[in-house]
Amino acid sequence: SGTATNLVAYQTDASCDCLIEADNNGDNFDATPVAHPTLRNLYLVGNGSSENKRGIRLRAGTRANIDGAKVTGKPNPLTIETTQTDDALANGTSVLKNVQIAGVLKNDVTGGKYLSANFLTGQGNAENAQIAATWDDVAGDLSFAWLNDTWVTAVQ
């Protein structure tokens, strides 16, 4: 739970897996309090690995509100893995909006309810988006102007 804003992940090592992995409790997906973070303004660039495929991985009962994300460089840029997480997205407890992914949503839940069609009805959501993947492109993306702030350019 809690809120994080203005996050950048830029992977280069092929052994790196998820750009974000969000879990509630691996031993009890229904455990309370339920993890329910709010994430805003994310730019996530994967390493292009065919073995470490996941960008945003939502599982183990987690809920999430994500507003403003670009995810590229992973074959599965957005993955849903457990029934509780799927249910929270399907019933609106979790909300994804303004999320652009360079690929398609993957729901690994048997009989999953939150599918590409649901994702695409969210405000500003897009699959197969053309997203810049070099650091210069990321830092120059005008829709994420905060990336050009002095605190970001100082750590490059």
Give, region by region, the residue ranges found by the protein language model.
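Extracellular beta-rich repeat passengers
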Residues: 1-156
